[in-house]
């Protein structure tokens, strides 16, 4: 299993670079930080066309995180820590791999 992490510094500004990376390296899971977009403007369709599902905790400015995966994401949550400033900085999901559960924290 290939798991990649990338501080993209704006998913919408870098979507072509991200798609190129996915096509070249085909990671099973890509965890992105600083996506800098709310959920409503996140490019879900770009990832769906590449057969990846998304779990997104979006926010403008320097925040926002996402996990994209070839495998079904289960037990997702974005409230691991109660952040009084409501900043989108951490998400959790699990995937099944070879009869095991892999816990992802991004």
Q: What is the role of each PLM region?
A:
Residues 1-53, 62-65:
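N-terminal, active-site-proximal structural segment of metallo-dependent hydrolase catalytic domains
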Residues 35-38, 42-106:
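Structured beta-strand-rich core segments of catalytic domains in phosphoester-bond hydrolases
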């Amino acid at each position: 299993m290939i798991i990649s992490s990338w501080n993209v510094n704006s998913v919408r500004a870098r979507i072509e670079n991200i798609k190129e990376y996915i096509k070249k390296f085909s990671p099973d899971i890509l965890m992105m930080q600083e996506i800098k977009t709310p959920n409503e403007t996140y490019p879900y369709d770009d990832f769906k066309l590449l057969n990846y599902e998304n779990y997104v905790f979006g926010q403008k400015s320097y925040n926002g995180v996402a996990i994209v995966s070839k495998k079904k994401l289960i037990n997702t949550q974005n409230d691991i820590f109660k952040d009084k400033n409501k900043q989108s900085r951490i998400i959790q999901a699990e995937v099944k791999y070879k009869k095991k559960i892999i816990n992802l924290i991004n």
